[in-house]
A protein has these predicted regions:
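Signature of exported/secreted
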Residues: 1-213
């Protein structure tokens, strides 16, 4: 859950947790994949996530999550097919920072959104460190998760009534450029670098204290 506390000096955004709370999240991502500069394919990735708040301590929550990832490759498959199931357990604090074992493959993006320690209002911007994590087992035979840092830019765009709900609207953007460390010689092709751009609009339900969409 996300809590947005309105005050005269602005809004303080923070997560809050209730022991035993359970909820589901569904996300869909559209991406264009390029290999060696040439477009390989476009795909839609559907994530269905179940979350169990197993423990709460000092304002942080220990979240036990099950991820079901499905994919639809445009021009090849008309329907989504199940790609992978994952389980992850991690702590997340009031601002959104993760404490998680490095062996977990999910979630792919960590510490996003990360809220400022003080209050914010529409028009404010900030930046914060985050992390991407990728599963290269199937395509490249890399058994451990690949981690690399990203720098995320945030803009508090506005407050908006969306489907009857008063929301705080954030624009979240970052670019990736990561050279993959050389691995032992292999007969399989290995990635040299990973580049990309992520842009998302994030809506927080101010009254309910939850992510709206």
């Amino acid at each position: 859950h996300l809590e947005a506390a309105d005050g005269g000096e602005g809004t303080r955004l923070k997560y809050r947790y209730a022991p035993g709370e359970k909820y589901r999240i569904v996300t869909e991502i559209s991406e264009d994949v390029f290999i060696n500069g040439a477009r390989s394919h476009s795909s839609d990735i559907l994530n269905k996530i179940s979350v169990d708040t197993a423990e709460v301590k000092n304002g942080s929550g220990r979240l036990d999550c099950f991820f079901r990832m499905s994919e639809r490759i445009q021009g090849r498959y008309e329907a989504f097919f199940l790609k992978e199931d994952y389980r992850s357990v991690f702590w997340r604090d009031e601002r959104g920072a993760f404490t998680i074992d490095q062996g977990y493959f999910m979630p792919v993006v960590r510490n996003v959104p990360l809220f400022p320690p003080g209050t914010v209002r529409p028009g404010d911007t900030w930046s914060a460190a985050a992390e991407e994590v990728h599963d290269l087992r199937r395509g490249y035979g890399v058994e451990r998760p690949l981690h690399f840092p990203v720098r995320v830019q945030y803009s508090y765009l506005r407050n908006e009534v969306r489907e009857g709900v008063n929301t705080a609207v954030l624009m979240i953007e970052y670019n990736t450029f990561h050279r993959v460390p050389a691995a032992a010689p292999s007969s399989r092709p290995m990635p040299d670098k990973i580049t990309g751009t992520s842009v998302q609009t994030w809506y927080g339900d101010i009254a309910a204290g939850t992510m709206h969409s």
